[in-house]
Swiss-Prot record:
Gene Ontology terms, MF aspect: nucleic acid binding
Gene3D superfamilies membership: 3.40.1350.10
Pfam families: UPF0102
Family in the record: Belongs to the UPF0102 family.
Annotated protein name in UniProt: UPF0102 protein Athe_0977
The species this protein was found in: Caldicellulosiruptor bescii (strain ATCC BAA-1888 / DSM 6725 / KCTC 15123 / Z-1320) (Anaerocellum thermophilum)
Taxonomic placement: Bacteria, Bacillati, Bacillota, Bacillota incertae sedis, Caldicellulosiruptorales
Organism domain of life: Bacteria
Length: 119
């Protein structure tokens, strides 16, 4: 698999994982002029913006470590756009989670880690 395929594979795994853990998936790969958010979900009355990071090795660190401050600001701006243009006037809480997907050289999942309220 190339990097794009690995990313898509990880996002699909993350969707299944989140559903099994009680999340309602609202959107996947939400795109606007400001950028993209991998998954937008709802857990109870909380809207959750999820960044998915999939890795085959730890050579470049943990997957979540690639969600640096600049990336966090970028995700927050896209989330603000989504909130402004796609949600009703209902009051929601908001949260940013990261899902780490670890796969081996044969594309077998070795671990999925959910980091709630990651930033």
């Amino acid at each position: 698999m190339n990097l794009k395929q690995v990313g898509r594979f990880g996002e699909n795994l993350a969707v299944d994982f989140l559903i099994k853990h009680g999340y309602e998936i609202l959107r996947t790969n939400f795109r606007c002029r400001l950028g993209e958010i991998d998954i937008i979900a709802k857990e109870d009355k909380t809207i959750v913006f999820v960044e998915v990071k999939t890795r085959k090795s730890l050579k470049f660190g943990l997957p979540s470590e690639s969600v640096n401050f600049k990336k966090q600001l970028h995700i927050k701006k896209v989330a603000e756009y989504f909130i402004a243009y796609h949600l009703s006037q209902d009051k929601y809480l908001y949260r940013f989670d990261v899902v780490e997907i670890f796969i081996d050289g044969k594309n077998n999942v070795t671990k999925i880690n959910l980091i709630k309220d990651a930033f």
